[in-house]
Amino acid sequence: MGFLLSAEQVLQFVTNQWQDPYAVLGPQQIEQGETSFWLVRALVPNAKQVWLVERATGQAYPMQPLHPETLFELCFAPGTPVPDYFLRAQRVWDPEGQHLEEWEDPYRFPLEKVNHIGELDRYLFNEGNHHRIYEKLGAHPISVDGVQGVHFAVWAPNARNVSVIGDFNHWDGRQHQMKRLGESGIWAVFIPGVGPGAVYKYEVKTAWGDIYEKSDPYGFQQEVRPKTGSIVADLHTYTWHDQEWLEKRAATDPLRSPISVYEVHLGSWMHASTEDPPADGHLVPVEQKPNTRFLTYRELADKLIPYVKELGFTHIELLPVAEHPFDGSWGYQVIGYYAVTSRYGSPQDFMYFVDRAHQEGIGVIVDWVPGHFPKDGHGLAFFDGTHLYEYADPRKGEHKGWGTLVFNYGRNEVRNYLIANALFWFDKYHIDGLRVDAVASMLYLDYDRKEWIPNCYGGREHLEAIDFFRQLNTLIFKYYPGVLSIAEESTAWPMVTWPTHVGGLGFNLKWNMGWMHDMLNYFRMDPWFRQFHHNLVTFSLMYAFSENYMLAFSHDEVVHGKSHMLGKMPGDLWHKFASLRALYGYMFTHPGKKTLFMSMEFGQWNEWNVWADLDWELLQYEPHAKLRHYVATLNQLLRSQPALYTQDTKPEGFRWIDCSDHRGIISFIRYGEDPREWLVVVCNFTPVVWPNYRIGVPQRGFYRELLNSDAVEFWGSGVGNLGGKWTDDWPYHNLPYSLELCLPPLSTLVLKWQPPQLAEDSGENKAMLE
């Protein structure tokens, strides 16, 4: 039941101090004594005249102003119902009435009828357990009584008033005010006539009267930087073709599968000229590189995916593709967690990219940043005039070194925002894994802080973040079995990849940062001095099976003056390439899944520069082209040899032959689950040829050389074992048989045992038998 407005109430309403516009605007039934009549109110800022137009007859009824150029009202005679109508207005900037505006009155649709956020939704959200809240909050195109529009909803519990602003209302927050839904802190409104592609923001009026214009935290798309508006997007318009891939993924144990990841920053992998615009016209220039543009998601699908498939990688890992305002952050300072960045195209374009990858047998992993967010005014910071998403105390809620804010993991709605976001990427974009950034910064309350607040037990462990990770990973694997949840955790925090029910964090992989640092420190040394630091090569096997590890040479290792991979290797050109091949060979035979950053596959000299694309011209030179061929060969070896992946996380999958040869040589065996699947690996990290090097082996027979990193085809010297070696009946290294090998300089050898009878019957070995 409606009511007549006093002058004071009119002033409150037109100054956005009302929390239920539906009680004032639209059709209102008024009762005065025994008399009952209907009236319609409309808030139209900067209107010279407003009409209510009866749809059936076209009759226009002028509305009377209750407040100059803002609030208008039309009363109907008692007993006269409100007809089906729309509104028409003449704005003050159109004195001649040449450009009248017409629109559907959003407030003629009762919110109870159009609102799809029920009491259960609000309860689960406030409890922190609404796993698909992204289907409720944000902007969602819907149809009501045949009228197309968008349902907007946002969480801002401490705001005095919230409105939707956009081109459709001249960015005036008075026209489309939202209604507060009970005590949930959620505000909602249905705006007819708005559809996909419309740019909008939320105008948030704080309790202190300040007004902020905020992007939608749950928005599915945003404008290309430097613009900051959200864009209405319908994520249901793309038709997927990857059902077979998804079914196979759900039935596969990734820990027993070959995983080799190509880490990519989409904005700097490859560029195009602005004189060669994309077919869809979505041309976004690269900052600091004139006459150059980004490739679109669809162009990347045509170029990047075939490239990755040719090299044999199993997955592509994308540096963050959630919307971020600053290119120089590499994507790690996210504003729109639910919006795939518009730099490279639309949400449907990104779906196409993932779909194409799946059709080519390649998984897609996305870097995810729940540890912090930037302070940009249009983002999450101080969202409703209070520290809503972040901790209020800067000793807990701010990363001084990064200039960013920390999510309040103890607040139900914030935790829900992040966990639902992780599930959203699997649900809507069919991704195959998340690589969670900067986990250590979340686990420790004193991480990079001089002043910090201890937990309730006096310790430095961030208990709320620990609970967050456990809930996150439990839900990821509940809904999406077979996917990856990878932790970038740079400390020795225990049980990162252990199940949550035994006290672990629940990830299924963790980057092995210790192995990476040890190996880079070792290979930086002159080979002569490596003999004095042999422990750097072998130490990783002391803990290799305490977690499920991924060996990663990531983007962080080729920036900020660290030099690129070749630049880390000592010696002349030949020795640099030989050392890098030996390192990659050891990496691909060492227990653990693999990750290489883009450009490492062909040996770029320059450090990674986010403003430039890769130095593709290097591939015209033989050493670089053959290094790329070598990486492709390693990937093919990994895929074809179960001994290299089925027991990556089990101590049964590894045995040292000799780890104590301080001349810089190691040898070991990798075992598959099938007892007949095993490989012998020998690494010579010195520039010396060892022509009569003997190692012990467990079985008599012929050992075929599957890989020699010093082969001529890889730009090596060609020293080797002529395809393989027969065993000698001499025990060695506490094993019953032995091989006498010729070890090439700076090399990795991989040999596969063949039983004597099989070897003798093999045509490729007849010459050696003779």
Curated annotation (Swiss-Prot):
GO MF terms held by the record: 1,4-alpha-glucan branching enzyme activity; cation binding; hydrolase activity, hydrolyzing O-glycosyl compounds
EC number: 2.4.1.18
Pathway: Glycan biosynthesis; glycogen biosynthesis
Biological-process GO terms, alphabetical: glycogen biosynthetic process
Enzyme class: transferase
Active site, per annotation: D437, E488
A Pfam cross-reference name: GlgB_N
Function: Catalyzes the formation of the alpha-1,6-glucosidic linkages in glycogen by scission of a 1,4-alpha-linked oligosaccharide from growing alpha-1,4-glucan chains and the subsequent attachment of the oligosaccharide to the alpha-1,6 position.
Similarity comment text for this entry: Belongs to the glycosyl hydrolase 13 family. GlgB subfamily.
InterPro entries named among the record's database cross-references: A-amylase/branching_C, Branching_enzy, GlgB, GlgB_N, GlgB_N_E_set_prok, Glyco_hydro_13_cat_dom, Glyco_hydro_13_N, Glyco_hydro_b
Subunit annotation: Monomer.
Keywords of the record: Carbohydrate metabolism, Glycogen biosynthesis, Glycogen metabolism, Glycosyltransferase, Transferase
Protein name, UniProt field: 1,4-alpha-glucan branching enzyme GlgB
One GO cellular component, as annotated: cytosol
Transmembrane segments: none
The reaction(s) this protein catalyses: Transfers a segment of a (1->4)-alpha-D-glucan chain to a primary hydroxy group in a similar glucan chain
Origin species: Synechococcus sp. (strain JA-3-3Ab)
